[in-house]
């Protein structure tokens, strides 16, 4: 069983992540984790914060000489801006002199619509929304991406590869034929796009739209898609509701800040089709079972089919709008404009990378549930043995 936790505040000393349940023998490097964290910073429309904040990563437990030990893995991401925030975000009771003049020490009493500010203040009885936003911030996803980097390293040992791309920003969307999805070999080209869009023409239109929305003092949301190749048939279960892989994946994507909807495969579009067109018909190809299409997104009945996994997340526009929205000053009970914190115009490209990590962690859980072992060698043996045990007349094509 794989469990993982994160801790830390947006402007705190560091983010901390713990991964428990990984087998021994997974190759892990700081370079790989650092590369994944740098991908999270990609995308036109990110805030100035991405330019001067650095993700300084430390593996403090569970990895020795580039390989996991089977014990909990501990990852620390130090805040490079901690010096500016140390007096304000100290866990100790601060001196009055440290808090008197600093602009950062001022309370935030104007909760931002669309954020967790007001509900967090109500839930915990806080009078200052900083006590909410520091943890609710999407900065926490850096720790998720670090965990996801380790999960990806594990999955790649089983020839399972995960990527993402942006399908839509605002009203601008990519239009491609069924089956013409990006492959893992396309990841470098996707990452080189300023909006991480697979199609060059659509990418330029998205960039133009972001320029326009920035001039208007507004923000945009959109849709990203995560794909996983190399998944064997049989991950997940139809036996219990909480073991259905599509349910677990949906929860994982929905947990990403600002995601408001999740679709697997063709998602909502399937509801408009007749049954004769909506389902993936099964045929024989070179002696193996395969499907003529992938409307289902690689999951049927909560179980993987062997086709590519496709899951999309729809992200609402960034809630911190430069053209401040109406709110109420909690300290005076008077109408006010919402506090404006430094933020992105659009974070869909970054959310896509976070989505990769959430999918990688969820699939890793399913892999360990089915093929669990104490070492990577043992899991590889179990994985191979399972594939070899499937009766020949039932074996499906595994899409890679």
UniProtKB/Swiss-Prot annotation:
Protein known as: Chorismate synthase
Pathway per the UniProt entry: Metabolic intermediate biosynthesis; chorismate biosynthesis; chorismate from D-erythrose 4-phosphate and phosphoenolpyruvate: step 7/7
Matches recorded under CDD domains: Chorismate_synthase
Known partners and oligomeric status: Homotetramer.
Catalytic activity of the protein: 5-O-(1-carboxyvinyl)-3-phosphoshikimate = chorismate + phosphate
Binding residues annotated for FMN, in chain numbering: 135-137, 257-258, 301, 316-320, 342
Gene3D superfamilies according to UniProt: Chorismate synthase AroC
Annotated keywords: Amino-acid biosynthesis, Aromatic amino acid biosynthesis, FAD, Flavoprotein, FMN, Lyase, NADP
UniProt-annotated binding residues for NADP(+): 40, 46
InterPro entries reported in the protein's UniProt record: Chorismate_synth, Chorismate_synth_AroC_sf, Chorismate_synthase_CS
Organism classification: Bacteria, Bacillati, Actinomycetota, Actinomycetes, Micrococcales
Keyword Lyase belongs to the record: yes
Known role: This reaction introduces a second double bond into the aromatic ring system.
NCBIfam families: aroC (TIGR00033), PRK05382.1 (NF003793)
Family that this chain belongs to: Belongs to the chorismate synthase family.
GO cellular component, as recorded: cytosol
HAMAP family xref list: Chorismate_synth
Organism: Tropheryma whipplei (strain Twist)
């Amino acid at each position: 069983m794989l469990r993982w936790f994160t801790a830390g505040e947006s402007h705190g000393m560091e983010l901390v992540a713990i991964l428990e349940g990984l087998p021994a023998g997974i190759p892990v490097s700081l370079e790989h984790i650092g590369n994944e964290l740098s991908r999270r910073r990609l995308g036109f429309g990110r805030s100035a914060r991405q330019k001067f904040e650095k993700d300084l990563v430390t593996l403090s437990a569970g990895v020795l000489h580039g390989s996991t030990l089977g014990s909990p893995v501990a990852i620390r991401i130090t805040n490079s801006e901690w010096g500016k925030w140390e007096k304000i975000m100290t866990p100790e009771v601060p001196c009055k002199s440290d808090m008197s003049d600093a602009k950062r020490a001022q309370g935030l009493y104007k909760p931002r619509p669309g954020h967790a500010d007001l509900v967090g203040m109500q839930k915990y009885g806080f009078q200052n929304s900083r006590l909410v936003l520091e943890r609710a911030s999407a900065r926490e996803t850096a720790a998720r991406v670090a965990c996801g980097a380790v999960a990806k390293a594990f999955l790649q040992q089983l020839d399972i590869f995960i990527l993402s791309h942006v399908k839509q920003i605002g009203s601008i969307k990519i239009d491609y034929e069924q089956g013409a999805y990006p492959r893992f070999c396309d990841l470098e080209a996707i990452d080189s796009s300023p909006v991480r869009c697979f199609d060059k023409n659509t990418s330029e239109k998205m960039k133009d739209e972001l320029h326009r929305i920035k001039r208007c003092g507004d923000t945009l949301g959109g849709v990203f898609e995560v794909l996983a190749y190399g998944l064997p048939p049989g991950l997940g279960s139809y036996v219990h509701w909480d073991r259905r892989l599509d349910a677990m994946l949906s929860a994982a994507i929905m947990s990403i800040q600002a995601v408001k909807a999740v679709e697997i495969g063709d998602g909502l579009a399937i509801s408009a089709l007749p049954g004769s067109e909506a389902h993936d018909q099964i045929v024989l190809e070179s002696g193996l079972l395969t499907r003529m299409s992938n409307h289902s997104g690689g999951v049927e009945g909560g179980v993987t089919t062997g086709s590519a996994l496709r899951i999309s997340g729809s992200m609402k526009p960034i809630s911190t709008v430069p053209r401040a929205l109406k709110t109420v000053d909690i300290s005076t009970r008077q109408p006010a404009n919402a506090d404006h914190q430094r933020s992105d115009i659009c974070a869909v490209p970054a959310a896509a990378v976070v989505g990769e990590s959430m999918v990688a962690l969820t699939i890793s859980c399913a892999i360990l549930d089915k093929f669990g072992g104490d070492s990577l060698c043992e899991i590889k043996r179990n994985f191979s043995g399972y594939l070899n045990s499937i009766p020949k007349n039932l074996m499906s094509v595994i899409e890679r």
